[in-house]
């Protein structure tokens, strides 16, 4: 259906995100790709992709084809690089990796990103410290499309694109004062990125968390990173057959901080907002699962209107 829609809209360029790995992903039916972007390889979907970073990377690198320019994540784990280099060599193509020495995350307001990358000074539409690396990749992708394939993408267009980028449920700020933030992080890497973003914003345990996870995710490691950010956590059961119950998550969360199981997502958000208000805290963060994010987002948008 997506390809049909793209065809009907007569798109000049299409950005496809793989859903599961790359080699056997549905998006890999496209015979020729201009650019293959490999973001950070982490531990997720291990029951399908493998239990080591090199196995997972080998699946991800399956999107690399002959004639494709490869843009790689600046801080790619060393263990993941072997399969990526092998796939690029077999496809007779080169790898572009943004130079970390050329990338600076500039200080700005809370939960706002500004970067300087190779002379491109830009405000980013996406919060999250990790988005600086993604922005550098986006710049390299645009430059590759210009250099290798003749697409006329101006510097102003690149800067505007970085500023306009939005992704629902990806460290999404729905209200600033008091804070309502939604993030679909569902693995340890995502939890670390959210925690790093909240820490950099100097909230210092001045937040209330609403947390729901799936039972097959590494939620114990996620809790280790996220719990220090919260004065209290309300646990919920996401709307998914694979969900960990709010009660089971609460048992684990209470080893880290004050935790209470809520009857529903709506109940948790209501209690979290009230707790933050009564204790003069900065706000509420809902995170742990995209299933939770889908249910929570309409409720948070309604709350943000008050």
Locations of regions flagged by a protein language model:
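Flexible, gly/pro- and Lys/Arg-enriched active-site loops
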Residues: 22, 41-50, 229, 234-252, ...
